[in-house]
């Protein structure tokens, strides 16, 4: 794959298409997050998308993955457990934006890694996905099989103990929108969950069991043979300005304070670059 012509404007193409407003918002926020934050971060650590084979697990609308193609990725694979989303939304977005990507329904924990994926990728991305997975260690172990020697995993997620780490904002009650309400005693929080009818109810309950932390990810990564190339922590996430279409929202990084456990626990985003041995 080669970068798009200089007059190519994928964001304008997506905005102009007859897409659901949520699809438009999500794709653009993903694309701009990758261009404005993720790809520059990778470059600062010597990881380039140019000529690279890239995979994104849990790619959703595919904006991040397609930004990697725009940056020169030679091959791009997007997977998600929601096959209907890939078929009806992501494929359409790729066509409208003018990118060639492979899209496949796949579960990184419960399904085998196809032979032709193993050892193929220079970069794998797992953005806001790992907190939903039942076993962090198995996920990291399986992803390691995708990577070439010296390959890098980019991983971001909101720790459970962060203000909205319980994803309680997905529930359809006003009180559930409050920060830290998921940190109430489980029996009390469960009462709020039980009052909702949202399809996200079961996922909020699952997250309350998983309760993923940055420290658990760090420990699992080292145990699975990764080296921590870099780690960052944010009190205000880089994606907010694009996700909510509020350019004035700052990105507030608190990595300089991350030696303190409470900072790692309360950060709204933990982000890691993990490298497998060469």
Where do the model's predicted regions map?
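Conserved N-terminal segment of class I S-adenosyl-L-methionine
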Residues: 1-119, 123, 140, 236, ...
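S-adenosyl-L-methionine-dependent methyltransferase catalytic module, highlighting the catalytic core
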Residues: 21, 134-142, 152-275
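Active-site micro-motifs of SAM-dependent methyltransferase domains
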Residues: 108-110, 131, 162
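A short beta-strand submotif of the Rossmann-like class I SAM-dependent methyltransferase core
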Residues: 126-129
């Amino acid at each position: 794959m080669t970068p798009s012509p200089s007059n190519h404007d994928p964001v304008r193409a997506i905005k102009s298409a007859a897409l659901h407003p949520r699809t438009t918002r999500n794709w653009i926020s993903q694309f701009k997050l990758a261009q404005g934050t993720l790809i520059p971060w990778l470059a600062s650590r010597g990881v380039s998308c140019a000529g690279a084979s890239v995979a994104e697990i849990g790619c959703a609308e595919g904006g991040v993955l397609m930004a990697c193609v725009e940056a020169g990725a030679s091959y791009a694979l997007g997977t998600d457990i929601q096959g209907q989303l890939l078929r009806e939304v992501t494929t359409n977005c790729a066509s409208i934006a003018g990118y060639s990507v492979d899209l496949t329904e796949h579960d990184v924990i419960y399904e085998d890694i196809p032979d032709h994926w193993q050892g193929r990728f220079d970069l794998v991305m797992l953005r806001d996905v790992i907190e939903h997975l039942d076993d962090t260690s198995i996920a990291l172990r399986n992803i390691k099989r995708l990577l070439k020697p010296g390959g890098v995993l980019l991983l971001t997620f909101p720790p459970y103990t962060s203000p909205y780490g319980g994803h309680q904002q997905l529930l359809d009650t006003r009180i559930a929108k409050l920060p830290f309400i998921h940190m109430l005693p489980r029996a009390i929080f469960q009462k709020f969950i039980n009052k909702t009818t949202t399809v996200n109810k079961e996922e909020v309950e699952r997250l309350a069991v998983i309760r993923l932390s940055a420290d658990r990810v760090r420990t699992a990564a080292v145990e699975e043979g990764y080296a921590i190339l870099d780690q960052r922590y944010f009190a205000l996430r880089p994606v907010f300005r694009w996700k909510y279409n509020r350019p004035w929202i700052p990105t507030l990084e608190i990595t300089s304070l991350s030696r303190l456990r409470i900072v790692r626990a309360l950060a709204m985003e933990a982000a890691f670059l993990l490298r497998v041995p060469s």
